[in-house]
Amino acid sequence: MDPEPTPLPRWRIFLFR
C-alpha cells in the first residue's frame, strides 16, 4: 500500500503486530 518500494511494508508490520 506504500507508494515507495519498501523491503517490509508498514501495513505488513501492523498485521504482524
Curated annotation (Swiss-Prot):
The record's keywords, sorted A to Z, are:
Leader peptide
Q: Which InterPro entries match?
A: MGTL
Q: Which protein family is named in the record? A: Belongs to the MgtL family.
What does this chain do? Makes mgtA transcription sensitive to intracellular proline levels. At low levels of proline this proline-rich protein cannot be fully translated, and stem loop 'C' forms in the mgtA 5' UTR which permits transcription of the downstream mgtA gene. Osmotic shock induction (0.3 M NaCl) also depends on mgtL translation. The distance between the mtgL-translating ribosome and the nucleotides which form the downstream stem loop 'C' is critical for mgtL-mediated transcription of mgtA. Cotranscribed with mgtA.
Q: Can you say what this protein is called?
A: mgtA leader peptide
Q: Which organism is it from?
A: Salmonella typhimurium (strain 14028s / SGSC 2262)
The taxonomic lineage of its organism, from the top, reads: Bacteria, Pseudomonadati, Pseudomonadota, Gammaproteobacteria, Enterobacterales
Gene designation:
mgtL
